Amino acid sequence: YFYEIIEKIDGVSLYNVWHTFSEEQREDIIKQLCDAMKQIHSNIGEKYDWTKTMQEKFMPLYIQAKNLNIFNEEEQKLLDYAYSKFNKYLDSNDFVLIHNDLHFDNIFYNDGKIKLIDFERSMYAPRDFELDILYRMIRKPWKFASEETERYTDSGDYTNIMLYIEKYYPELVSNPNLHQRLAIYDMVYFLEQLVKHPELEELKNDVIFGAKVVALKDEITFNDVKTPMELMDFMNVNIEYGWIDNQGFKHLNNLKGFRKNYRISSIDKMLEVGLGTCIEQAKMIKYFFDKMGFENKLYCYRSYETEENFDKDIRMHCFVLFKYNDSWYHFEHSNRPKRGIHKYDSVESAIEDITSGFKDHGDIRKLTEIDSIPSGLTFKEFNNFVNEFDDTKRKKI
């Protein structure tokens, strides 16, 4: 153990000022942070059984969660399978001293320079464990902000941080299994929160999402799927509702920064990261039915206050209907309460039921049948694409 008495640090939490910086200033600050991490990580520790450490953290929490009946049978099977992969992904040789609580309330800023505070959780661990808190903060910055600074957090301001870390500290992100390792760390972290607050569905979803990421590499591939039910099973395991921003960062079940930073992902990208909005999911569902020879219809429904306000206050839902044995079905995955394959007497009755949930929002409502969803468009560009689509297929309802 070592101790150091330091003088009072001048400055403010980085959370207080991050939103005011230019991108050039942000890059310089992350470069300083990388230099500070390198200095801390230069203290090499002895190797120990990291896999066993994480297993011993996870299992008592998991048993407690099962005793609380938090997870259903299907979810337990997924978690059991993900746990069986800890040995595969957690083997480590690179043990260093880490800060272990790096978020912006523990980084002080003054006159262009940063200083780190609050080293009480420091430990020797694999180098990438430093990202456990830091990467989670990048994805959900408001979670680690104080009550005073939370109002300044906009996830769009954090999208380039990992790019700068890769540039100035590539060793920190060099593990080939980094994606799975960070997902395991998430499983442990969110499970610990969940057993304290079992009523919070968001925490449960975070644990399940981490397990799906760990299991993703070994599951059935999209090309193996042959029937609508197999497609639903595949998507239940491999696709969560979320989006990828224009820097490639993932956002699970939150829309902060969506309008500013969203780009429609390709099917391959959605499968790679396991996230998609109703737009990407409808794109993939239509692709599947086209490939399998099912007659199908792809729709985009929008409701908004006025024509002039279409890109500011709009609700949108993309969905697919398909025909099987002379009946029409709605294949819904992205809308969790409606998830499933639903049979209807006609296309019209399906549309009436699907769009009824949006009737209370906005005076202008449009339903447009489209034949494709281009990748790479912003939300506004996609809305324009749909609005300008073949007028003969557009319905106002």
Task: Give the positions of each predicted feature.
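Active-site activation/catalytic loop segments of kinase-like enzymes and analogous catalytic loops
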Residues: 129-173, 186-200
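Active-site rim recognition segments
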Residues: 323-396
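Active-site catalytic-loop/activation-segment of kinase and kinase-like phosphoryl-transfer enzymes
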Residues: 4, 38-41, 49-89
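ATP-binding pocket architecture of kinase catalytic cores
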Residues: 1-49
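Active-site acidic catalytic loop and adjacent metal/ATP-binding pocket
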Residues: 2, 81-129
